[in-house]
Amino acid sequence: MEVPPLKLLLHACCCPCTLEPLRLLLEEGHDIAIAYMNSNIHPAEEYEHRRAVLLDFAREQGLEVIEGVYDPQAWSRAAGVFGTDPDQRPDRCRACYRLRLEEACAYASANGFEGVATTLTVSPYQYTETIREELERACEPHGLAAVFRDYREQYPEATRRSKAMGMYRQNYGGCV
């Protein structure tokens, strides 16, 4: 669904997954700032590495990055309670998406953004429909547009581009 160009906060899970959503959203005419709000990433060194790669890329592109508070204890309270049982993964992921998207929406609302989008749907390993539900749920009380896109088809191009750029590519989503 096309939306008119907005002042948009793009929640980014990592830099490689940001490449294609950012390109496409800029082509749509949105005024974008990137939100790095990912208390799920463990250990802290991995969080910092992904953050540094994203900051370098954003600086090269002339884009602002808004950093959330790194609070793995908040993630543990929200999502860690579901443990590592594979049967609990959908609930754990939902809680993780909720925590991160609520943080992004609260910031967006307080700082004059009109909508929120996320790069989480680039990965074919995520629950895309759950991400849509949580993005809409987080945006609604703030009166923000939930700019949802299913970017799974862009995963191969994001992978190709990030490798061509020599970009750090992690081999796991970040959660413990």
What are these regions (language model features)?
Residues E2-V176:
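Nucleotide-activated chemistry modules centered on ATP-dependent adenylation/adenylyltransferase
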